[in-house]
Amino acid sequence: MRELTKRQNEIFEYIKQTVHAKGYPPSVREIGEAVGLASSSTVHGHLSRLEEKGYIRRDPTKPRAIEIVTEQLGEPINMEETIHVPVIGKVTAGIPITAVENVEEYFPLPEHFTSTHNSDIFILNVVGNSMIEAGILDGDKVIVRSQTIAENGDIIVAMTEENEATVKRFFKEKAHYRLQPENSSMDPIYLDQVTVLGKVVGLFREM
């Protein structure tokens, strides 16, 4: 295989480390941040050189689709299968949660992170500290299984009256529904009606 420049080697090593640690490759932005390149076009250029030299393969139709062809000793990397899960940026009343209008991007998750079919799963970026006592922190990505019903005590994603998605613990009580924060400094939300968008089944945190 053709020799790499210093910068190409830095990028290749970072891709390998990320694949080994997470099971999927980094994004162009993450590569740029790791090696000190502000321009995404410059990163794309280096990735093209790595591909030309036979170190990686890319699929232009998929995000983060970088496959390592070989390691230095010629051993193939055991790269875990991933699925591309929609990341929901907003919630629009009257249309499915994973409709194109709601999707900000697609995020690759190792297949073992989900126990159901890809079409039943979406990701929501957590904003705020209302669930910190359940271990769900600001900036986390919660993995959500689409469903319209919930049992008492489930952590769910619900639609508020302002058509925003909120993560809370669900309780159906005698005269109302209670959406309970997992933060002792915050009050519960009481609603006559609640729209359940899904149940939180996992969490992903980027360090």
From Swiss-Prot:
It comes from the Bacteria. Residues 28-48 bind DNA. The active site is at 130 (for autocatalytic cleavage activity), 168 (for autocatalytic cleavage activity). It catalyses: Hydrolysis of Ala-|-Gly bond in repressor LexA. One of its GO terms (biological process) is proteolysis. The record marks 93-94 as: Cleavage. InterPro entries: ArsR-like_HTH (IPR011991), LexA (IPR006200), LexA-like (IPR039418), LexA/Signal_pep-like_sf (IPR036286), LexA_DNA-bd_dom (IPR006199), LexA_repressor (IPR050077), Peptidase_S24_LexA (IPR006197), Peptidase_S24_S26A/B/C (IPR015927). SUPFAM superfamilies: LexA/Signal peptidase, Winged helix' DNA-binding domain. Pfam families: LexA_DNA_bind, Peptidase_S24. The keyword DNA-binding applies. Keywords: Autocatalytic cleavage, DNA damage, DNA repair, DNA replication, DNA-binding, Hydrolase, Repressor, SOS response, Transcription, Transcription regulation. Its EC number is 3.4.21.88. GO terms for molecular function: DNA binding; serine-type endopeptidase activity. Homodimer. Represses a number of genes involved in the response to DNA damage (SOS response), including recA and lexA. In the presence of single-stranded DNA, RecA interacts with LexA causing an autocatalytic cleavage which disrupts the DNA-binding part of LexA, leading to derepression of the SOS regulon and eventually DNA repair. NCBIfam families: lexA. Belongs to the peptidase S24 family. This is LexA repressor. It comes from Staphylococcus saprophyticus subsp. saprophyticus (strain ATCC 15305 / DSM 20229 / NCIMB 8711 / NCTC 7292 / S-41). The gene is lexA.
